[in-house]
């Protein structure tokens, strides 16, 4: 019968050999893919500037006074853009926002005419 020292050594070497064999497994193997799969993070439904957090939150139930006259602008370019402003905000930022939109739409119109 082999000595206990020899049996322990063989057992240790076989365990190390198994770890080495598992470490060298292909990244494409199904077992490795199962181990590496993680649940993707889902982004929140709405993105809000930090200064406006809670002002227009539908969960709160009540909005700031003066929010009855809201301005909402949505348009589709290569991507969707939506902007929602309260009455006070539209008075404060409306002119700048209008100029910004006009510049964007004017550049797009010029590119369309140049392509034709």
Swiss-Prot record:
GO CC entries: axon; extracellular region; extracellular space
Residue numbers covered by the propeptide annotation in the UniProt entry: 51-74, 98-116
Primary localisation category: secreted
Post-translational modification summary for this protein: O-octanoylated by GOAT/MBOAT4. O-octanoylation is essential for ghrelin activity.
Source species, domain of life: Eukaryota
Record-annotated disulphide pairs: none
Keyword hit for Lipoprotein: yes
Any one GO biological process: regulation of response to food
Lipidation (O-octanoyl serine): 26
Subcellular location: Secreted
Lipidation (O-decanoyl serine): 26
Residues recorded as bearing Leucine amide in the entry: 97
Sites of O-hexanoyl serine lipidation: 26
Annotated region (Disordered), positions in chain: 29-67
PANTHER family: APPETITE-REGULATING HORMONE, GHRELIN PRECURSOR
Family, similarity comment: Belongs to the motilin family.
Name of this protein: Appetite-regulating hormone
Lineage: Eukaryota, Metazoa, Chordata, Craniata, Vertebrata
Gene designation: GHRL
